[in-house]
Amino acid sequence: MATKQSVTTREGDRIAIVAGLRTPFAKMATYFHGVPAVDLGKMVVNELLVRHGVQKEWVDQVVYGQVVQMPEAPNIAREIVLGTGMNVHTDAYSVSRACATSFQSTVNIAESMMAGTVQVGIAGGADSTSVSPIGVSKNLARALVDLQKTKTLGQKLNIFKRLSLRDLAPVPPAVAEYSTGLSMGQTAEQMAKTHQISREEQDKLAHRSHSLAAESWEAGKLSSEVMTAYAEPYKAALERDNNVRFDSKLEGYAKLRPVFDKKYGSVTAANATPLTDGASAVLMMTESRAKELGYTPLGYIKSYAFAAIDVWEDMLMGPSYATPIALDRAGMTLNDLTLIEMHEAFAAQTLANVKMFASDKFAKEKLGRDKATGEIDMDKFNVMGSSIAYGHPFAATGTRMITQMLNELNRRGGGSGLLTACAAGGLGAAMIVETE
């Protein structure tokens, strides 16, 4: 068992999530087409500061993340500081932990507070799959470097003669793991087959996610945590996530064909998250600083954990490894939790993790534990839907989940919630938050 964790400052202050906000999430090449992640990040952070009356000189540190990196803005956090009018001396750095990026940025702010160097911070993440770095072939890249060393026209022509027409074609961002060559979708297919997750089960989970997300939007639950976005050419606003199916019908999911294993597969575009654009952020303070400034926190971080596993098989099983560590560090069991949200990269991955949470065999063979983490009560699980419905701008999902969980716990009268996510590279994240 992991040692119990104390997420407090040296003076005993808890680490507070004071507020959270996100843009609506939009499918790739729709509303935010042409809007880079740095602009999405500036948009949401500026609105967060204005909406909650935060004087910009209060902010000691910004930690922000991005997965689809743009070479022209490698430190998105610093660009957000400079682009929102914060004090130029505000410390800012960027992080990347694939789909768990904004869990990492939140933890980094928390750990700075625990160390006593920060009292007010902003964490979050943004991604745009609509504005991606388009590369060139290795041969062309090498030729362009060599051209800089040439002096004569003849030398330049000799370099160009080495190139074929294929070398001149643009190279889109890779969708496969660098270490294995496998895509996330291929891993989801492997997990579906290995853990016997049927197509029907996957479609049912996707339908459930869309239905609960639609209900949450219609009930007004998300209106306070999702800003209205205005993007160029400013002809229309976006107020809601445009991936949510407000008319979801289970029978419609069966019509789609598998994407990653066309003959024997079960993972489709409907039971997986789409490529998405969006940004999110949370305002964090030490408990005493929040009280001093007159803020009532949404809640507090109780524990957190990260895990890393093999990438060749079950690469998206990170939640099953990280969660028991976070529970131990909180001194809790799965049954103690009020709510649970697990990031839905794919329905297959989500359901495989749900199975492993309840598996004594998995606990003994993979975790070295005597018994399973526990069987998830589905009445507590992803009660507002999750990423299959809302979408998944990679770096923005973690702080989307934190804000959404704390607001829902407060609506229910308080309690504790588990947030957990898989991530590329065989990574996993888990965080337990609590409200008064």
Curated annotation (Swiss-Prot):
EC category? transferase
EC no.? 2.3.1.16
Q: What InterPro entries does the record point to? A: 3-ketoacyl-CoA_Thiolase (IPR050521), Ac-CoA_C-AcTrfase_FadI (IPR012806), Thiolase (IPR002155), Thiolase-like (IPR016039), Thiolase_AS (IPR020610), Thiolase_C (IPR020617), Thiolase_N (IPR020616)
Gene Ontology biological process: fatty acid beta-oxidation
Q: Which GO terms describe its cellular component?
A: cytosol
**Gene field:** fadI
Q: What is this protein called?
A: 3-ketoacyl-CoA thiolase
Active site feature: 99, 392, 422
